[in-house]
C-alpha cells in the first residue's frame, strides 16, 4: 500500500493530475504521462474495473466517492472501495468519510469549494482538524485564494476546476498549489 510520503512525492513529481470524468477521459489518461488519476465517474458495478485499468497502466488511482453512482455518503462506501477495488485512495467533500478512509488505510483528498468569503473562512476552520493527506480547492483558478489557504496549512494543496491552459497551471503552482487536477 502506498504511504503518505510516497503520495506527496508523486504529487510533487507529477504536478498535473488527470481528472477522469468519462470513458474517453479514461482512455486518454491511460496513455498520458500523468502518474495520478482522480476518477470522477462510474458506478458501483464498474468502478473496480476503472480503477484496475488505471493500476495496470501504472497510475495512482483516487476515487471521488461522492460522484460514484449507486453509492451513498456512508462509511460502508469507503469499506466497499477499500475491499473491492485496488484504489490508492478516495476523494470526498465529507470529513467523516475522509476520517473513515484513513482508518481503512486509504490515502485521502478532501475537496473544498470556495464559493464566497464565508466558505473560505470555514475552510480555514475545517483544515485545523482535517485528517486528509491533501486538500483540493475548487475552482483552482484563484491564485490569491490558493496562496491564502496554502499559507494556513501544512497539507499539500491541489487546485482543481476550471483549469484550462498552461497559464492556469503555472499560476496555481506559483500560488502554492503542489499539483493541479484537470481534464
What is each PLM-predicted segment?
Residues 19-30, 74-80, 118-126, 165-169:
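Short, acidic/polar
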Residues 73-97:
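Ordered, amphipathic secondary-structure segments that act as subunit-interaction surfaces
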Residues 1-65, 69-71, 86:
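Conserved N-terminal beta1-alpha1 strand-loop-helix module at the mouth
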Residues 19-23, 67-72, 91-95, 113-116, ...:
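Glycine-rich beta-to-alpha transition loops that act as phosphate-gripper elements at the mouths
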Residues 17, 38, 62, 91, ...:
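Conserved beta-strand positions in the central sheet of alpha/beta enzyme cores
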Residues 39-43, 97, 139-145, 161-183:
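Glycine-rich phosphate-binding active-site loops on the catalytic face of alpha/beta enzymes
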Amino acid at each position: 500500500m502506498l504511504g503518505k510520503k510516497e503520495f506527496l512525492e508523486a504529487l510533487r513529481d507529477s504536478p498535473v493530475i488527470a481528472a477522469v470524468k468519462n470513458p474517453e477521459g479514461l482512455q486518454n489518461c491511460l496513455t498520458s504521462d500523468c502518474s495520478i488519476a482522480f476518477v470522477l465517474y462510474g458506478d458501483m458495478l464498474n468502478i473496480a474495473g476503472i480503477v484496475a485499468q488505471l493500476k495496470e497502466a501504472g497510475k495512482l488511482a483516487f476515487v471521488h466517492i461522492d460522484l460514484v453512482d449507486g453509492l451513498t455518503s456512508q462509511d460502508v462506501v469507503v469499506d466497499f472501495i477499500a475491499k473491492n477495488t485496488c484504489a490508492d485512495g478516495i476523494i470526498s467533500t465529507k470529513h467523516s468519510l475522509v476520517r473513515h478512509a484513513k482508518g481503512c488505510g486509504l490515502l485521502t483528498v478532501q475537496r473544498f469549494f470556495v464559493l464566497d468569503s464565508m466558505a473560505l473562512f470555514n475552510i480555514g476552520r475545517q483544515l485545523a482538524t482535517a485528517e486528509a493527506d491533501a486538500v483540493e480547492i475548487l475552482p483552482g483558478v484563484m491564485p490569491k485564494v490558493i496562496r491564502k489557504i496554502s499559507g494556513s496549512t501544512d497539507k499539500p494543496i491541489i487546485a482543481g476546476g476550471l483549469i484550462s491552459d498552461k497559464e492556469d497551471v503555472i499560476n496555481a503552482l506559483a500560488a502554492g498549489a503542489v499539483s493541479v487536477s484537470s481534464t
